[in-house]
């Protein structure tokens, strides 16, 4: 499915345990409609030792968030994203105030 969000956009989390937090999109899974937001939805992952000399580790990792639970965040405003044509180029803009992204 086509989305209007891109890697590097600042978004705000709308639902879940990290509601209200903002962060930058690290990756987008367009097939499963998930996004990974930097420093949001952190989970603990256990890395098993491969050899007897190594120790197991527990690391914090960002888990994906459903794309419907995030919204573009710019200048303190959350807004939906629209597309308009200027000089035969597609431009993304915030629908709430008309500002270009």
Curated annotation (Swiss-Prot):
SMART domains: KOW. GO terms for biological process: translation. It holds the Pfam family ribosomal_L24. One of two assembly initiator proteins, it binds directly to the 5'-end of the 23S rRNA, where it nucleates assembly of the 50S subunit. The lineage of its organism: Bacteria, Pseudomonadati, Spirochaetota, Spirochaetia, Spirochaetales. This is Large ribosomal subunit protein uL24. It comes from Borrelia hermsii (strain HS1 / DAH). The keyword RNA-binding applies. One of its GO terms (cellular component) is ribosome. HAMAP family: Ribosomal_uL24_B.
């Amino acid at each position: 499915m086509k989305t209007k969000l891109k890697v590097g956009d600042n978004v705000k989390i709308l639902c879940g345990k990290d509601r209200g937090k903002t962060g930058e999109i690290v990756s987008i899974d367009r097939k499963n409609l998930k996004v990974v937001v930097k420093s949001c939805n952190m989970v603990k992952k256990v890395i098993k030792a491969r050899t007897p000399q190594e120790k197991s580790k527990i690391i914090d990792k960002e888990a994906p968030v459903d794309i419907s639970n995030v919204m573009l965040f710019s200048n303190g405003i959350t807004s939906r994203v629209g597309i308009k044509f200027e000089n035969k180029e597609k431009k993304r803009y915030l629908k709430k105030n008309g500002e270009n992204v």
